């Protein structure tokens, strides 16, 4: 039986029994997704849900949803895990971890408050006018936010949606053909908790293809007040071409990440961290380590220890299924590296691949837990491989070394500096791809104080007409 993915408009699962269907093949299994009609577009464009919720009400709703995801018997969670395994090729452990993280994000009330506090300067600014300088300021939602999701990291879609919810924006979510499940499961869980809740009613989920008739997608894009685009170069280019001229575009495009191991005294701890950063999401994420730069003389010991830790991850977080082409690319990379006389070691059943090669001698990168290790003398030999708009995360072991290198790494384009083993946890207060996303999802409105309000520099009321009449402007210049 072919699985059918629902279309959701305004928090309501649509009856698409008479619709045309688009068939996707995922992990050798068929999925049907309804094709959007003109009436669907009109329903999306006319949707206008009044959202007078406070930040407390928003966070409490998300927490309630998160408690459902926390339950291992929640039917929506169980179905989601099965879908990730069957259609996306996730291992049981990977799929369960993804569901666990959804629960963690939704249930972390303090973190949700702090995200707003850190990005917008105050968690109250979306609810009320806040005194700032000589004004009162309030942050209002942009309006309709269109989310063009990627399929490589399901949690990126969850994050995108939650940012829009926290800033009271409506969400029009275009799922990826590689993962039509995550956003749909999340919004269905909103419906399970409260189908009439303003957050539920302000969200729509659907799919369209960039390579087919664009008449319908263009109409949807035309109503966007802000576009959040995730994915590769083609996806970002498509978003840029089709977003309205007035709409802001948040671009989360393709990035690469590296690890620096700085002559650690605890080689095992460093290897554990690097192994995690290689294995999480099987290197499909922008934050996944692909290259390791080892500063010091104990690279052989580190190489062997890293191999052991990769074997451990083979057991505690098995990699997902791969198709024939992916396996062939893995084998080809191994043979090319052996032919180049590099030191090569691989795990059982292609569970991982480790290659020691000179810095700059990059071969193919099949991902799927394959990494290159390069021995260098100091940080100056790493910097040529750190690039603006390309290098996202630099993971460092030991953590203390990050203080030595953070300035030069930042100057050359690194966007995020972390402790090895923490690549998938974006700390509250940090930037994402060089920006604070929530600031781009709101409009700041200023209510400025009157002429009678004195400033720090001018202790009398501002009487501009009098200053002109008496030609006394310069008297008040500090």
Curated annotation (Swiss-Prot):
Which GO terms of the molecular function aspect are on file? acyl-CoA dehydrogenase activity; long-chain-fatty-acyl-CoA reductase activity
Domain of life, per the record?
Bacteria
Give the pathway.
Lipid metabolism; fatty acid reduction for biolumincescence
Q: Where exactly are the transmembrane stretches of this chain?
A: none
Keyword match Metal-binding: no
Q: Which residues form a coiled coil?
A: none
Q: Determine if Oxidoreductase is one of this entry's keywords.
A: yes
Entry-linked SUPFAM superfamilies: ALDH-like
Keyword line: Luminescence, NADP, Oxidoreductase
- What is this protein called in UniProt? Long-chain acyl-protein thioester reductase 2
